[in-house]
Amino acid sequence: MAKEDNMPLVTTTEMFKKAYEGGYAVGAFNVNNMEIVQGIVDAAKEEQSPLILQVSAGARKYAKHIYLVKLVEAALEDSNLPIALHLDHGDSFEICKDCVDGGFTSVMIDASHHDFDENVR
């Protein structure tokens, strides 16, 4: 059942600032299906802990972007905890942009497939 005034997704910047000020760590967990999301969120609820749910490029292909976003939206309703949705190791600008446009609050680009000069230009 949905709770009133559900907390929206938060950014990792906001989350890390609060963690730094509060002297605690935030767990980041890769997810790709409902059971994994439920297990992680249930544990976070017990601890009343914020969390980062991460999605890899492979998970986006496996489970589809829209399904993963909806799972995380359900986690917000179920937990009312601070949750960030993070793209882990996006391999292109386009994938990162697609994730931001599609509801992710954090992305990390991994351009290690490019040579050093391309990465530092």
Predicted segments, located by residue:
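Hydrophobic faces of well-ordered beta-strands that scaffold small-molecule active sites
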Residues: 26-30, 51-54, 83-88, 107-109
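Active-site-adjacent beta->alpha loops and helix N-cap segments on the catalytic face
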Residues: 38, 61-69, 91-95, 112-121
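Long, hydrophobic/aromatic-enriched structural stretches that serve as scaffold segments
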Residues: 87-92, 102
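Glycine-rich, positively charged N-terminal anion/phosphate-binding segment
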Residues: 12-13, 34-79
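N-terminal amphipathic alpha-helix/helix-capping segment at the start of soluble metabolic enzymes
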Residues: 2-27
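Glycine-enriched alpha-helix->loop->beta-strand junction motifs that scaffold or abut catalytic
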Residues: 47-49, 101-106
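Glycine-rich tight-turn/loop motif centered on a GG-T
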Residues: 24-25, 54-63, 104-119
